[in-house]
Amino acid sequence: LTCKTCPFNTCANSETCPAGKNICYQKKWEEHRGERIERRCVANCPKLGSNDKSLLCCRRDDCN
């Protein structure tokens, strides 16, 4: 599985997920500097936090 890894809306960077991390993840939230994005490989889909705008977990290459 490969997942996107950059903190931008348009993301060309991907990484091959290590063993045990078979979910691609993307979280968006607002800060005083504007919208922030986190993308990576995870073992479990995290819960949506109170400050999060959106949360995406998926199991296809580069789906985040």
UniProtKB/Swiss-Prot annotation:
Record keywords, A-Z: Acetylcholine receptor inhibiting toxin, Disulfide bond, Ion channel impairing toxin, Neurotoxin, Postsynaptic neurotoxin, Secreted, Toxin
InterPro entries (UniProt xref): Snake_3FTx, Snake_toxin-like_sf, Toxin_cobra-type
BP GO annotations: modulation of receptor activity in another organism
Tissues with expression: Expressed by the venom gland.
Gene Ontology CC: extracellular region
SUPFAM superfamilies noted in UniProt: Snake toxin-like (SSF57302)
Pfam families attached to this UniProt entry: Toxin_cobra-type (PF21947)
Keyword Membrane carried by entry: no
Main location class: secreted
Superkingdom of origin: Eukaryota
Example of a GO MF term: toxin activity
Compartment(s): Secreted
Disulphide linkage map: 3-24, 6-11, 17-41, 45-57, 58-63
Function: Produces peripheral paralysis by blocking neuromuscular transmission at the postsynaptic site. Weak inhibitor of the endogenous nicotinic acetylcholine receptors (nAChR) in the human rhabdomyosarcoma TE 671 cell line with an IC(50) of 690 mM. This neurotoxin is lethal to zebrafish by injection at the back of the dorsolateral region, but is not toxic to mice by intraperitoneal injection.
Family recorded in the similarity comment: Belongs to the three-finger toxin family. Ancestral subfamily.
Protein name as catalogued: Long neurotoxin MS4
Species the sequence originates in: Micrurus surinamensis (Surinam coral snake)
